[in-house]
Amino acid sequence: MATVTSHDELRDLLGQPARRSAEKERRTLHDLDRQWLAASPFCLVATAGADGTCDVSPKGDPAGFALVLDDTTIAIPERPGNKRADGFHNILDNPHVGLIFFIPGRDDTLRVNGRATILRDAPFFDEMAVRGRRPQLAIQVEIEQIFYHCAKAFLRSELWHPETWHPDVLPRRAALVKEVEQPAETLADLDRHYGPEYAKNLY
């Protein structure tokens, strides 16, 4: 097994980025960035704790859920979940976050890197309400880098091509949880938990 152990070695292998890739980072939102955020219903939030422990958490809501506060600040609402709060614990120790915003059907993505603050309340929480419920918390991100990421990973994977989707290659959620995570629980109980009622308690 051959490993890469230096930045110089890595550059020797990969070469230098093209000018349009090297110079695409910005620190403020363009109007097109605002339009992208308004059209995006889903993002991934990457964090790392002080000890290096990493987490990537999906966040999703109706399109436009990431609220633009000003040219360098956005906020992402937190909805009821499993209460692990792995990413939040990481942010308390290390505020640096990386975000990727998706628009279904598009092969490019919008990336945002910055410093996060956890908010327990703010006047704009009312704007984030869904079905009459305000968020429990919000992640406010001060933008340090923003740029668009190329489409090659999506093109290679054919991610948005329905003919490549095969969701039934694995057991349903309840059966998977019983097999991997909670073998002592009954499948009937897990089916009830992950059944139709599961989608009724999103907010």
Where are these regions (language model features)?
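Binding-site signature for planar aromatic cofactors or substrates
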Residues: 1-203
